[in-house]
């Protein structure tokens, strides 16, 4: 822990999301338009923004089309033009889960340009559907942050 954020948490979480949750529960955690996760993400972004005409080499993932500006009510406003639609989903689940687990509280001002719900309470109140999905015991998602004391 400490004041420095461990970036490996984000990268490991992305791998688990991309190859684990999506593979086991595609209709729920699929990173494509129409999955439960994607519908929740589109709501958090204030709409569905993607370039439907561009299909990546895997055949179903659509290239992202970040809007020139997000709607004023959006709380997920990731603006990396290189992030495809599936990538946007991965980032959304990362931001929501790490906020629920308490990893983002001290970074609220630093991440506000991408994610406005930096605490568990903010996720519960403003995006209750993603909170309910990520805390549903059926999916056995993390319930605490790693603390580096494995096997001790």
Roles of regions detected by a PLM:
Residues 1-58:
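Acidic/His-rich structured neighborhood in mature extracellular/periplasmic domains
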Residues 1-4, 82-89, 122, 126:
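Extracytoplasmic/periplasmic, Sec-exported soluble proteins
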Residues 48-109:
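Extended, compositionally biased non-globular segments
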Residues 90-152:
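Pan-zinc metallopeptidase signature
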